[in-house]
């Protein structure tokens, strides 16, 4: 909201207004704000949870000192969700499709986890929400994200293609690129041009392989119209698998003091850096990685994510004063999965 407020006031020459246009400045503010919210608002939430006796039920796994944690407040993931949401609303570009998807993911997965914790704590049902329903709702989220990536015109990549020219100056487009705009930005001007074209793509970035890219259309056994449908079906299916796996994987990781929050913060730092690089034309070209317009906002969101987790770690590290519960772990995993897919 602050970002959009400064956009509305750009004609009034307010001192320091230009700083809000820098991703790095907004990322710093988002991180610090989320951390402070986790630290100070989190303390009040923990006291409220203790007062209401919203404690964790501990299963006896034979681990040393584990029964001492019985009664420790749970549902602390509310602290993380609150810090991320407020910081994101203040400093992110809310018109950006990537920001919208990540906010939706946070609320969706947080809602699943909150419902699960609520059933466990207030309904005194140790099983919580049934595994079937949790899985179904995660799969639904995967399809929503996948179909948005497939059909939303704002989610594109800039690909380099090679355009051959004959001696008489006639331009020949590569096979499958008959709709390429020949007036696209020319990168190298010689007998064979390297040009850039903004397109919908099923490519993803993979480290440690030549060219760093893998295209899911390579898995399609068909060509032409059926090939187009098949490659997107495979791509959406992979998105569903990644989101479901990340969400449940983080949920399983949340078994020791500070483990899920600490490791997720490290993952968030890496994703934030990669998102910033992918969203910057100069840096992505220099590092030979895919340029994805608009993903810089993911870096701002992940900064809020990191700040919220670091603030929460103050209370969650050993000896833990609060547990995040499924409210936090499912949301954290969903955020990691979706943000990794988008870059």
Regions found by a protein language model. Name each.
Residues 2-46, 80-111, 118, 132, ...:
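Alpha-helical transmembrane segments
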Residues 45-68, 118-127, 190, 199-212:
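Cytosolic, membrane-interface loops and tails of multi-pass inner-membrane proteins
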Residues 65-72, 138-144:
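Cytosolic juxtamembrane regulatory segments of multi-pass membrane proteins
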Residues 62, 67, 226, 230, ...:
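ATP-dependent carbohydrate kinase catalytic cores
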Residues 210-220:
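A short, charged helix-loop
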Residues 26-33, 62-71:
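Glycine-/proline-rich flexible loop or hinge segments
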Residues 17-22, 69-70, 125-129, 226:
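Short, Lys/Arg-rich N-terminal segment immediately upstream of the first membrane anchor
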């Amino acid at each position: 909201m602050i970002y959009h407020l400064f956009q509305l006031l750009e004609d009034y020459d307010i001192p320091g207004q230009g700083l809000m246009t820098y991703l790095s400045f907004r990322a710093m503010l988002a991180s610090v704000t989320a951390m402070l919210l986790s630290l100070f608002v989190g303390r009040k939430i923990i006291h409220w949870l203790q007062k209401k006796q919203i404690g964790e039920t501990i299963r006896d796994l034979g681990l040393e000192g584990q029964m001492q944690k019985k009664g420790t407040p749970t549902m602390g993931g509310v602290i993380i969700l609150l810090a991320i949401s407020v910081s994101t609303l203040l400093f992110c570009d809310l018109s950006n499709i990537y920001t919208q998807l990540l906010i939706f993911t946070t609320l969706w997965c947080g809602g699943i986890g909150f419902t699960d914790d609520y059933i466990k704590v207030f309904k005194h049902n140790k099983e919580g929400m049934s595994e079937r329903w949790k899985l179904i709702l995660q799969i639904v989220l995967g399809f929503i994200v996948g179909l948005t990536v497939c059909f939303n015109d704002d989610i594109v990549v800039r690909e380099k293609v090679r355009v051959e020219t004959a001696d008489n100056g006639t331009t020949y487009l590569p096979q499958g690129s008959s709709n390429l705009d020949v007036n696209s930005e020319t990168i190298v001007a010689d007998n064979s041009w390297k040009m850039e074209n903004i397109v919908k793509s099923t490519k993803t970035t993979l480290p440690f392989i030549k060219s760093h890219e893998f295209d899911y259309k390579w898995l399609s056994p068909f060509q032409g119209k059926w090939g187009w449908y098949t490659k997107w079906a495979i791509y959406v299916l992979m998105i569903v698998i990644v989101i479901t796996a990340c969400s449940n994987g983080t949920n399983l990781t949340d078994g020791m003091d500070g483990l899920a929050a600490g490791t997720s913060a490290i993952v968030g730092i890496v994703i934030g850096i990669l998102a910033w690089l992918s969203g910057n034309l100069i840096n992505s070209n220099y590092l030979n990685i895919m340029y994805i317009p608009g993903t810089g906002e993911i870096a701002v969101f992940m900064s809020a994510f990191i700040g919220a987790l670091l603030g929460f770690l103050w209370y969650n590290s050993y000896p833990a004063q609060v547990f995040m519960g499924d409210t936090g772990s499912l949301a954290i995993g969903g955020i990691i999965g979706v943000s990794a897919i988008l870059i």
